UniProtKB/Swiss-Prot annotation:
Name of the gene this protein is made from: gabR
Family: In the C-terminal section; belongs to the class-I pyridoxal-phosphate-dependent aminotransferase family.
Record-given protein name: HTH-type transcriptional regulatory protein GabR
Domain of life the protein comes from: Bacteria
Ranges where the HTH gntR-type domain occurs: 14-82
Length: 479
């Protein structure tokens, strides 16, 4: 049988055996090589192509392994009988335009994003040292499947940490580690009653809202008052599960006082199977005031599901979060029996070493002071540039705050101009859970300062001024 194979012998080309393999596969699929026909012997094809027998043998062995050829002892290799494809071969696959990702190079942009941490000040060398120690100490653990809830010693380290820093009352057995809060929330929806009605803060965390909706859950929204979730609205709407961010309401920045926390706990205790999901968002960083302990620390009825993450205190890319389940839900979890751990064992063990070595608390202390100074410089620059035409809210905690501006421009106008000025920033409407809710009052923007470089503060504020007013301020009233 004559087979014509043209080989590319340039340095950039695929290996010779791969080219032979690809050509023969194509000939078989196109029926140019018919089923049960004999292909040339390895030596014959090698001589024809002026290549080594090993190259031809590697190609034949791959085709044999994939089922394109079969071998008969002392007779050689033959083409396997394959069904014809039911469709014609198309040109190289092209993704529809609406599914393509558009990459925008923002390396030269100034970022007021609320979704980041300050990577420039992350102690990467300390983290790598801890990783090396963890790998050396527990390398056998890396060869095993991790416990579904996470490695016990890691859960114990996190339990001690949140008991000390947040007042959370729990045992390691109650904790589940996962690769992000959304992963844990998805799991939680499967543990809570199927018919449970959820309620979230409005405005709030839209991704979590969409996760619940996509899971087929009924989700109500609760407007905020000056203390957080409105008790009157909760009483009126009668949900079964509240999702709240009491330490630093996302995105408004409100810190829920103890009086409202007690009201929420009493509400949960009024009826069986009511729960509060406490997303302890941004709890590590408070300024000018001491941290208020977690809502879970006040819980006397085991109705609070506590959720925490290391995305803000360390790095979002580590993807390590955790939740603490009340005994009733922990029992439901253990009865499932089919869950797998989603977080890397090495990341878990490195975190354990980072916490137990004291590096974590050292890092938090350093970053708290760093973020406080950066925040103060940013607010001072905003107030100076906008001459009293800006209101700052929710700046006592977390890595972002809310700003409202006296301007005729709408939020969308401001965001459009900001993008043109290479300024990354987001508006409050992004966090409206109800899509038909329209902007009322002054436009409000979320100002994140974690990623913002200190040397870019003044320039960033000046760009923001141009986005809000243009080159010349446009007053709200008057001509």
């Amino acid at each position: 049988m004559d087979i014509t194979i043209t080989l590319d012998r340039s340095e950039q080309a695929d290996y010779i055996y791969q080219q032979i393999y690809q050509k023969l596969k194509k000939e078989i699929l196109s029926r140019n090589l018919l089923p049960h026909s004999k292909v040339p012997s390895k030596r014959e094809l090698a001589e024809n192509l002026k290549v080594s027998v090993n190259s031809v043998n590697s190609a034949y062995q791959q085709l044999l392994a994939e089922g394109y050829l079969y071998a008969i002892e002392r007779k050689g290799f033959f083409v396997e009988e394959l069904d014809m494809f039911s469709a014609e071969e198309h040109p190289p696959f092209a993704l529809p335009d609406d599914l393509k990702e558009i990459h925008i190079d923002q390396s030269d942009w100034i970022s007021f994003s609320h979704m980041s941490s300050d990577t420039d000040h992350f102690p990467i060398k300390s983290w790598f040292r801890c990783e090396q120690k963890a790998a050396s100490r527990s390398y056998r653990t890396l060869g095993d499947m991790s416990h579904p809830q996470g490695i016990y010693e890691v859960r114990a380290a996190i339990t001690r940490l949140i008991s000390l820093t947040r007042g959370v009352k729990c045992r390691p057995e109650q904790m589940i580690i996962g690769a992000g809060t959304q992963v844990l929330m998805q799991l939680l929806t499967e543990l809570l009653p199927k018919e449970a009605v959820y309620a979230m803060e409005e405005p709030g965390y839209r991704r979590m809202y969409q996760l619940l909706k996509n899971a087929g859950k009924q989700v109500k929204t609760i407007m905020l008052d000056e203390k957080g979730m409105s008790i009157a609205e909760i009483t009126r709407q009668q949900p079964d599960v509240l999702v709240t961010t009491p330490s630093h309401q996302f995105p408004s920045g409100t810190i829920m006082p103890v009086s409202r926390r007690i009201q929420l706990l009493n509400w949960a205790a009024e009826e069986p199977r009511r729960y509060i999901i406490e997303d302890d968002y941004d709890s590590e960083f408070t300024y000018d005031v001491d941290s208020i302990p977690a809502l879970q620390s006040l819980d006397r009825f085991q109705n609070v599901i506590y959720m925490g993450t290391f995305s803000k205190s360390l790095l979002p890319g580590l993807r390590i979060s955790y939740m603490v389940l009340p005994p009733e839900l922990l029992r439901a979890y253990k009865q499932r029996g089919y869950d797998l751990q989603t977080c890397s064992s090495l990341t878990q063990l490195t975190l354990q070493e980072f916490i137990e070595s004291g590096e974590y608390q050292k890092h938090i202390k350093k970053m708290k002071q760093h973020y406080k100074e950066k925040r103060e410089r940013l607010i001072t620059a905003l107030e100076a540039e906008f001459s009293g035409e800006v209101t700052v809210k929710g700046a006592n905690a977390g890595l972002h705050f809310v700003t409202e501006f006296d301007t005729r421009r709408t939020e969308q106008d401001i965001l459009s101009h900001a993008a043109g000025l290479q300024l990354e920033i987001f508006g409050m409407s992004r966090f409206n859970l109800k899509e038909n809710k329209r902007q009322t009052g002054r436009p409000a923007l979320i100002i994140g300062f974690a990623r913002l470089k200190e040397e870019d503060i003044q320039e960033g504020v000046q760009r923001l001024f141009k986005a809000v007013y243009g080159h010349k301020k446009i007053p709200v009233t008057g001509d």
